[in-house]
Amino acid sequence: MNATPAPADDLIVIGKIYSVHGVRGEVKVFSFTDPIKNLLDYKTWTLKREGSVKQVELVSGRGNDKFLVAKLKGLDDREEARLLAGYEICVPRSLFPELTDGEYYWYQLQGLKVIDGLGQLLGKIDHLLETGSNDVMVVKPCAGSLDDRERLLPYTEQCVLAVDLAAGEMKVEWDADF
């Protein structure tokens, strides 16, 4: 394992190690990528947990619809693998594929101010949820927001009118009372 990872401000969390698998030092991974096996396309991972940062190399991986199993270079013991439980798996954003106009990664949307058609600040996007039919934005109140309500807004063409990353804003068609 290498102790010189990429700069922390360039890293995006794409998964999390949550357990061990078997006796050969493999780890179970929850992937935040879609499809989940895309996480295995990144061969060098930066692991972060509570101020601890380390870099590891992926040797092999496999999985199903729920989780992945990964073999990391130099990790051959179950007890050593157990120590990695809880680490977030990060990669530099520069490794992400380019998107077309109008497409965004979730990390780009998190933190955007959400403004309705009347110009009212509803809050900021805290995180997104995958629901099956469409993604859902969890909008939490912030300084200057209309009220102190948490809102769940669908990430759909009907709801999202415009995204301005430079301004840090998203315009939505949404009734503030809903």
From Swiss-Prot:
Domain PRC barrel: residue ranges: 101-178
InterPro entries in the record: PRC_barrel-like_sf (IPR011033), PRC_RimM (IPR056792), RimM (IPR011961), RimM_N (IPR002676), RimM_N_sf (IPR036976), Transl_B-barrel_sf (IPR009000)
Primary site of residence: cytoplasm
GO aspect biological process, one term: rRNA processing
Endpoints of the signal sequence: none
Keywords of the record: Chaperone, Cytoplasm, Ribosome biogenesis, rRNA processing
Protein's cellular compartments: Cytoplasm
GO cellular component, one term: ribosome
Keyword Magnesium part of the UniProt annotation: no
Summary of subunit composition and partner proteins: Binds ribosomal protein uS19.
Family: Belongs to the RimM family.
This protein's domain notes: The PRC barrel domain binds ribosomal protein uS19.
Record function comment: An accessory protein needed during the final step in the assembly of 30S ribosomal subunit, possibly for assembly of the head region. Essential for efficient processing of 16S rRNA. May be needed both before and after RbfA during the maturation of 16S rRNA. It has affinity for free ribosomal 30S subunits but not for 70S ribosomes.
PANTHER family: RIBOSOME MATURATION FACTOR RIMM
Protein name per UniProt: Ribosome maturation factor RimM
Organism: Pseudomonas fluorescens (strain ATCC BAA-477 / NRRL B-23932 / Pf-5)
